[in-house]
Every structure is written in structure tokens, then in C-alpha cells.
Amino acid sequence: MADLDQQFLLSQIARRGPWNDCANLPTVVQAASEQTRIGLVLADAAFDSERNHTYIRRELGAQSVIPAKRGKKTWRIHGVRAQMRREFSRRVHRRRARIESLFSSVKRKLSARAPGRSLRAQKRQALLLGLSFNLYRLRHRCLFSRMSTGPDGF
């Protein structure tokens, strides 16, 4: 989970992939909501489930913008998912592309792999990558805020 405006990671889970992360969305969102108020959750179609929409909207009081999965024609979409399909905002969901930019930045600046031998070490290294990226962003944000373009900034 990330703050797209500040480009910070708010919460993360590390596990061996490939894995279906749909069931983990409430856990990750809950961990992030303990750090800051969550007003909007953007996710891709892999996270589309009635359970996820209901959790985000009822438990957190946030808006969820998750495109509906394309399934069999016999699937009946009802409840919050049906409402999401009717009222889906492509303009708002376009902001989700920023998370891909953030992931790319983590991989470029730090690393794309956790080379530990054991699964436990790999998980720990993956979580430390997220922490390191946040520290990197804090440092560079402070440097940019101290820079001045005015003539008296020297």
C-alpha cells in the first residue's frame, strides 16, 4: 500500500511468488490505516471481490476504485461490485499507474531482488527494501525542500 501523492510505501507484505494477493488486501490496508487516514483505495482487477470492497467502504469509510474482473458470462455481480461497475471512474483509476512508477523506482534505486538463501531472509530483505526506499525518499525530499532557485538562496 502506498501514498501516491507523497510516493511513500505505507505497508507491505513479503511472500514467495507468484501468489494471489486478493485475500491480503484487507490486512495491508488495515496496517496502512493505522499510520494515516485512508480516503481512497485504488487497485487493479486482481483485487476485485465483494469482501474487499465491503471492507474498504464499511470498515475504513474509504472509497474503493477497483475495476470488475472479467469472468464468465454466467457470473452474477451484485452488491458493491455491481455498484462499482456502474459508477466506475476511469479518471480516478488512472492514478493507479503511479504505483507502477513507484515499484519501478524501488527496483531502479535499490534492487529488484532479495538474494538471501532462506525464505525468511528473503522476506526480511524485501521488507527492508521498502523501508530503505522510504528513507531514500525522505532524504531526497528534504534536500529538494532546502534548494532555492532565488538569487538570495546561496
Tell where the protein language model's regions lie, with residue ranges.
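Basic, amphipathic alpha-helical segments enriched in Lys/Arg and hydrophobic/aromatic residues
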Residues: R85-F154
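Helix-centered, glycine/charged polyanion-binding patches within enzymatic domains
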Residues: A45-P115
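A generic membrane alpha-helix/interface feature
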Residues: D21, Y55, A62, G79, ...
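Polybasic low-complexity intrinsically disordered regions
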Residues: M1-L60, P67-K69, G130, S148
